Swiss-Prot record:
Residues 29-164 form the MPN domain. Signal peptide: none annotated. This is 26S proteasome non-ATPase regulatory subunit 14. Transmembrane segments: none annotated. Component of the 19S regulatory cap of the 26S proteasome. Its EC number is 3.4.19.-. The gene is Rpn11. Disulfide bonds: none annotated.
Length: 308
């Protein structure tokens, strides 16, 4: 009975000491470019189902968690949950990664929420509890591959709040730094227990000069892309459609010239407001069809000479 009273905070022994250290919130999760790309690619491939995987990295200090790489887990998922981790596959995968020069430890796990934001469900909280039983600083990352667009990744990192702290009346966290910024919590995340059962950790992306060059060259076109031949049937149909559009634009341009002769200067100033400018569109179509045909003819001639 005494233990129950102490646990409930009804006795003086349950009061926390005033100088006791409180959990710090200055912690940041640094995710590498490779890990972020692999998480987004894995999440996009699993749509509309949830997917999950493990994050490899290191706990640099009390304020830094570095995620260097990730790998996918072969689990079955539904639209709203994923099952627990397979320990046998995890052990074999870590052994094989060590042989390839990837000795980092597991710092947490990630999973996708395709289309419904970043938060932890009841199943996710149970999975995170199993990770935090092995390491108190384990991180759960949630990524939304549907809402993520170029230049804005919808992602967030979470860690559970110790329920014993709330029972004893202690503050679960304290803010001692302004590094980084937290994601603005959504209504759905607050409904599912954000800041009650788990809290958010700020995420940062640390890139060196070589990684920036690699990312800039990821979808960069080379000189040979301009000489790639398109399918002749497709090229012919595109030419026919473009010429038909040019004919309509030429008729509209001729009609607009006739109308301009009857307009006053005030009417001429606003005649194209909110309307299609046939002259400009006609010039664009002519430039486009000339470029496509020149590249197609040049590529065909080069192929004829080279592979003769």
């Amino acid at each position: 009975m005494d233990r129950l009273l102490r646990l409930g905070g009804a006795m003086p022994q349950a009061a926390p000491p005033t100088d006791a250290p409180v959990v710090d919130t200055a912690e940041q999760v640094y995710i590498s470019s490779l890990a972020l790309l692999k998480m987004l690619k894995h999440g996009r491939a699993g749509v509309p189902m949830e997917v999950m995987g493990l994050m490899l990295g290191e706990f640099v200090d009390d304020y830094t968690v570095q995620v260097i790489d990730v790998f996918a887990m072969p689990q079955t998922g539904t639209g709203v949950s994923v099952e627990a981790v397979d320990p046998v596959f995890q052990a074999k995968m870590l052994d094989m990664l060590k042989q390839t020069g990837r000795p980092e430890m597991v710092v947490g796990w990630y999973h996708s929420h395709p289309g419904f934001g970043c938060w932890l469900s009841g199943v996710d909280i149970n999975t995170q509890q199993s990770f935090e039983a092995l390491s108190e600083r384990a991180v759960a990352v949630v990524v939304d591959p549907i809402q993520s667009v170029k230049g804005k990744v919808v992602i967030d990192a979470f860690r559970l709040i110790n329920p014993n702290m709330l029972v004893l009346g202690q503050e679960p966290r304290q803010t001692t730094s302004n590094l980084g910024h937290l994601q603005k919590p959504s209504v759905q995340a607050l409904i599912h227990g954000l800041n009650r059962h788990y809290y958010s950790i700020s995420i940062n992306y640390r890139k060196n000069e070589l990684e920036q060059k690699m990312l800039l060259n990821l979808h960069k076109k080379s000189w040979k892309d301009g000489l790639t031949l398109s399918d002749y049937n497709e090229h012919c149909s595109i030419n026919e459609d473009t010429v038909a559009e040019m004919l309509d634009l030429a008729k509209n341009y001729n009609k607009s010239l006739e109308d301009e002769e009857k307009m006053t200067p005030e009417q001429l100033a606003i005649k194209n407001v909110g309307k299609q400018d046939p002259k400009r569109h006609l010039e664009e179509k002519v430039d486009k069809v000339m470029q496509n045909n020149i590249v197609q003819c040049l590529g065909a001639m080069l192929d004829t000479i080279v592979f003769k």
